[in-house]
Curated annotation (Swiss-Prot):
Mostly expressed in floral organs, and, at low levels, in other organs. It comes from Arabidopsis thaliana. The keyword S-adenosyl-L-methionine does not apply. This is NAC domain containing protein 50. Residues 126-184 bind DNA.
């Protein structure tokens, strides 16, 4: 949600109550401000240091080291019960010219832990990230708590205006509370409270409801008509989970029916024979239209995207069906091999079965491809009478094709020999196992 634009959407005011501004302080259920480290540094912190506005003002400014961590929630611009907050804070140097910062509060202090981590975009260094843990009391006898802060700062960056170094002017702090000491495995998201949203008030949600405007187009009769279908919110969209149905007269709007009828309505003429010819032409055209399949676009004028999704779904189903059909070519042979190797219980038998199936599929796919090519060649329309040069070229192509087929047959023969050798080895192994079982049975009966 870090890259999404956000807009304030409020419920329409009542007729009696005056219109009031909606406070953009709460996110709608399911939406959370959760930017990445790169977005926090390269967008929010950088624009704050340069004094540039941001599209979504979600981070408040507070002197974070003058307040206890459990008191910081009231300074957050996003009113949420989630145990995670974001703030801008100015650094307070412990000494005027030194590099050490004063991170002590009235009841404790923030202590850095581990090394600062680099935030990069590919090879470009954007900023640094410091992890701090709040300790209650005074150093070095402070007690570690479950309050953690990630402090983001920019690397040395010269502003575009005066060239002064302002990388230490502000830092961005992400404060959160863990359930226990250790990695943040606990759930920092607060449970949903239905009563908080019972009034249906304004909420901050991502995205803007953009409506497409359709310009008026000149019609054939010279009148400019605006298509009101794009602005109507009461019409039903197509359900992509249902198959398309045939168009009915109710699906065609009255203006379309009138236009359709006027397009085929014969003009009045004093000549009775001309009128009869026009009427016969009209009947033929209507008969041709009855034979045509019904148009599906009439049902989907307001839903081009679901129609595309439906087409994609049908295409995926056709691809799956074609893959199933390809696998069915060798189903009988694979079943025979599986029945032959039913008695094999070792891992070597499974590997051999896989190899046999692969060889069978390879050979049968090649044979099916050649059959399809032959069928296409047989069904191709006869070519016109060719010149002697073209006949010679055709003969050369046939000779080349025959040589290619001969090489293909050689490969198929080699694969068949390999399969025969594999099957023979398995037969020998089964015979040996059978003899061993017979010996064991004979020794068991003798004893």
């Amino acid at each position: 949600m870090g890259r999404e634009s956000l807009a304030v959407v409020s419920s329409p005011p009542s007729a009696t109550a005056p219109s009031t501004a909606v406070s953009a302080t709460s996110l709608a259920p399911g939406f959370r401000f959760h930017p990445t480290d790169e977005e926090l540094v390269s967008y929010y912190l950088k624009r704050k240091v340069l004094g540039k506005p941001v599209r979504f003002d979600a981070i408040g400014e507070v002197d974070i080291y003058k307040h206890e961590p459990w008191d910081l929630a009231v300074f957050s611009k996003l009113k949420t019960r989630d145990q995670e907050w974001y703030f801008f804070s100015a650094l307070d140097k412990k000494y005027g010219n030194g590099a050490r910062m004063n991170r002590a509060t009235n009841k404790g202090y923030w202590k850095a832990t581990g090394k600062d981590r680099e935030i990069r975009r590919d090879i470009q260094l954007l900023g640094m990230k410091k992890t701090l843990v709040f300790h209650s009391g005074r150093a070095p006898d402070g007690l570690r708590t479950n309050w953690v802060m990630h402090e983001y700062r920019l690397v040395e960056y010269e502003t575009e205006t005066n060239g002064s170094l302002l990388q230490d002017a502000y830092v961005l702090c992400r404060v959160f509370h863990k359930n226990n000491i250790g990695p943040p495995s606990g759930n920092r998201y607060a449970p949903f409270m239905e009563e908080e949203w019972a009034d249906g008030g304004g909420a901050l949600i991502p995205g803007i409801d953009v409506r497409v405007r359709v310009e008026a187009l000149p019609q054939a009769n010279g009148n400019n008509q605006m298509d009101q279908e794009m602005h109507s919110a009461s019409k039903d969209l197509i359900n992509i989970n249902e198959l398309p149905r045939d168009a009915t007269p109710m699906d065609i709007e009255p203006n379309q029916q009138n236009h359709h009828e006027s397009a085929f309505k014969p003009q009045e003429s004093n000549n009775h024979s001309g009128y009869e010819e026009d009427e016969d032409t009209l009947k033929r055209e209507h008969a041709e239209e009855d034979e045509r399949p019904p148009s599906l676009c009439i049902l989907n004028k307001e839903a081009p995207l679901p129609l595309l999704q439906y087409k994609r779904r049908r295409q995926n189903e056709s691809n799956n069906n074609s893959s199933r059909n390809t696998q069915d070519h060798c189903s009988s042979t694979i079943t025979t091999v599986d029945n032959t190797t039913t008695l094999i219980s070792s891992s070597a038998a499974a590997a051999t079965n896989t190899a046999i199936s692969a060889l069978l599929e390879f050979s049968l796919m090649g044979i099916s491809d050649k059959k399809e090519n032959q069928q296409k060649e047989e069904t191709s329309p006869p070519s016109p009478i060719a010149s002697p040069e073209e006949k010679v070229n055709d003969l050369q192509k046939e000779v080349h094709q025959m040589s290619v087929e001969r090489e293909t047959f050689k490969l198929e023969m080699m694969s068949a020999e390999a399969m025969i050798s594999i099957l023979q080895s398995r037969i020998d192994a089964l015979r040996q196992e059978n003899e061993e079982l017979k010996k064991k049975n004979a020794s068991g009966q003798a004893s």
